[in-house]
Structure formats: structure tokens, C-alpha cells
């Protein structure tokens, strides 16, 4: 089971925000289904007036108080810094309690039997959730826990163009910007995508994790299938090997071709079986796994009987295939 609590609050009395409900709806939409429309997370969504102190705590307990494979909490709204702890501000905040303390959220995580526990906060001062020296030793990050926040302890989270800046990048990451070659999106790849998209003067996301391996949060469109990847890696006897090409691999190299003039045709002419292999190699090239050894383009590598080779990332996947990890 994969469960998620998604909270977005715009209508704070006297302190309205513009983008949080929109952010929550988009994150919920993306997490509920994978790109191929297969079911992903079961979603509980609390928006504006639904997002009271008691209601959020009740649903937080429901989402994290079982042995699910993945439990996720996303919050978009106001954050509050009271020196000793941070808080997410609920719709019914009052001067005596501005919302739910980060300490309380971490205690729910600590008590959870869920295998993978993920907290994503898009609010000001959210980075305090990862500052355990302020929250106390009782809430040291449990195994299987990942925290991703929009900004660091003393920073504000920014809204821009209909979304929070952080969540806009989170949405792009979940759409596929943070996917690997097989379409898998993990908390680590999301953080890397967001961090690399922000300038040095922008708010800085915080990422803390205590896991043995990252869980896949969503599957977007794959760039290559597992079958294609295994087939590709069999073309190279080792990670440093090259693959010999010749004109028979180039699909436009045949008598009567409209793409290549008669004087530029070369023997051996195109062969269908070699063309299938070349198509796979070109797909791998477009995804950064293979490159021509000496030519600028794969077309010239084939027509000039040159070779192609694995890139650094291609060598990594070759190793994964060799060791039957993929």
C-alpha cells in the first residue's frame, strides 16, 4: 500500500496565500497515478477549511499508523518559527498555537511502522524540520525516513506564476524531469532536480534521508525499456569495448535512396537486421548512453565504418546489466 496526505491552505484569515491549493491539487494528481495511468498512491486531500489542527493530525495518524510500503505527507501553506521549534500553520491557527509543531510530525514518523516515510514541506522555515539540534534527540531521523523542504531554517518560501517556486519544480520533477532511463522518480532524484534548477541567490531546499535505498515515488515515461537496455548491453563485451559499424547499418544507404545521392552510397548496403541494431544504438545515443568513437554523428560512424562506445553513464548501466540488477 502507498498512502499520501496532501494539504494545501490559501485562505488563512488575514494572511492569505495564492498558490497552495493549486500546488496541493497538482501534487495529488501526479502522485495518484503513474504516467501510464496505473494506480500509485491512495490520496487523502485537505484543502483550506478542511485543514484544521485536529483534522490534519487525525489524517496524519491514519496515513502513517500502519505498515504501508510508502506513507507521504505533503504540506503547502504558512510556516512559523517560534525559536525552539517550527510549525506548519493550520487554517484555525491562533496566537496561543500557530499550528502543528515539527516535533509532533516527527514523533508520528518515529512511531510509524511504515517502511518508507516521506515528508515534503513547502512553507517558510521548513528547514527547521531537519534541524534536530533544535527539536531534540527524541526525534532523531528514523530508518526509512526522508525529509524534503522548500527552504532552509531561516528562509522564506516563494510563490511565483501560480505555484510555489519549490512545488513548481517538484511538479516538473514528478512529470518526468527527475526520472531515470526507466522513468523511475525517487526522492533523491527530485532533490537533485530541484537543487540544480535554483540559482545561488534563490531559496535553497533541504534534503535529509536515512534510508538503505530510495523508493520510487512515481513512474513517468521510460526512455528505454529494460529489454532494450539488456539487449543494448549485450552488444558490448565489456564496459570499454567498442561496437563496429559499417554502411549496412544506415537505413538510408540503399540504391534508389532519396536521402543519399548515388555517388555517396557505400557497400555493403543497408541490411534490415543491422538497421534494428542501429536504431537501438541511436536511441541509446539520444539518451546519453552511447556515442560515436571518432565521428560527430552516428550516421557518419556507420558510413565511414567507424565504431561506437559506451559513455560514462552507459558503462554504469552495463555494470548493472552484467550483475543482473536490471
For each feature predicted by the language model, list its residue ranges.
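A short, glycine/acidic-enriched catalytic loop
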Residues: 16-22, 48, 55, 78-112
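Functional beta-strand-loop-alpha-helix junction segments that form "active/interaction loops"
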Residues: 28-69
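Accessory beta->alpha helical hairpin/"wing" motif in late/C-terminal subdomains of nucleic-acid enzymes
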Residues: 223, 287, 291-326
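Glycine- and acidic-residue-enriched helix-capping/strand-helix junction motifs
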Residues: 12-26, 160
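Active-site-proximal C-terminal subdomain of hydrolase catalytic domains
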Residues: 8-9, 31, 118-208
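Short glycine-rich His-centered loop
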Residues: 1-15
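Caspase-like cysteine protease fold
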Residues: 4, 179-270, 305-316
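Short amphipathic alpha-helical interaction segments
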Residues: 270-292, 305
Amino acid at each position: 500500500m502507498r498512502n499520501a496526505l496532501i494539504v494545501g491552505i490559501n485562505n488563512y484569515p488575514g494572511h492569505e496565500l495564492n498558490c497552495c491549493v493549486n500546488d496541493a491539487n497538482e501534487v495529488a494528481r501526479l502522485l495518484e497515478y503513474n504516467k501510464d495511468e496505473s494506480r500509485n498512491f491512495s490520496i487523502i486531500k485537505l484543502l483550506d477549511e478542511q485543514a484544521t489542527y485536529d483534522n490534519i493530525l487525525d489524517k496524519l495518524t491514519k496515513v502513517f499508523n500502519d505498515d504501508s510500503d510508502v506513507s507521504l505527507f505533503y504540506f503547502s501553506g504558512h510556516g512559523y518559527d517560534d525559536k525552539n521549534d517550527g510549525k506548519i500553520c493550520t487554517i484555525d491557527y491562533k496566537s496561543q498555537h500557530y499550528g502543528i509543531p515539527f516535533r509532533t510530525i516527527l514523533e508520528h514518523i518515529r512511531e510509524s511502522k511504515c517502511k518508507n516515510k516521506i515528508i515534503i514541506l513547502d512553507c517558510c522555515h521548513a528547514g527547521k524540520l531537519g534541524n534536530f539540534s533544535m527539536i531534540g534527540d527524541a526525534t532523531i531521523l528514523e530508518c526509512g525516513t526522508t525529509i524534503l523542504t522548500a527552504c532552509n531554517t531561516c528562509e522564506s518560501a516563494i510563490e511565483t506564476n501560480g505555484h510555489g517556486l519549490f512545488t513548481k519544480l517538484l511538479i516538473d520533477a514528478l512529470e518526468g524531469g527527475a526520472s531515470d532511463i526507466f522513468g523511475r522518480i525517487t526522492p533523491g532524484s527530485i532533490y537533485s532536480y530541484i537543487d540544480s534548477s535554483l540559482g545561488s541567490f534563490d531559496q535553497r531546499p533541504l534534503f535529509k534521508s536515512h534510508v538503505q535505498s530510495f523508493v520510487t515515488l512515481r513512474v513517468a515515461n521510460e526512455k528505454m525499456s529494460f529489454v532494450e537496455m539488456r539487449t543494448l548491453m549485450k552488444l558490448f563485451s565489456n564496459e570499454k569495448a567498442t561496437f563496429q559499424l559499417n554502411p549496412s547499418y544506415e537505413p538510408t544507404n540503399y540504391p534508389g535512396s532519396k536521402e543519399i545521392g548515388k555517388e555517396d552510397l557505400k557497400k555493403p548496403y543497408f541490411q534490415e537486421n543491422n538497421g534494428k541494431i542501429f536504431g537501438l544504438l541511436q536511441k541509446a545515443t539520444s539518451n546519453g548512453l552511447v556515442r560515436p568513437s571518432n565521428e560527430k554523428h552516428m550516421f557518419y560512424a556507420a558510413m565511414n565504418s567507424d565504431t561506437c562506445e559506451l559513455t560514462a553513464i552507459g558503462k554504469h548501466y552495463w555494470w548493472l546489466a552484467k550483475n543482473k540488477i536490471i
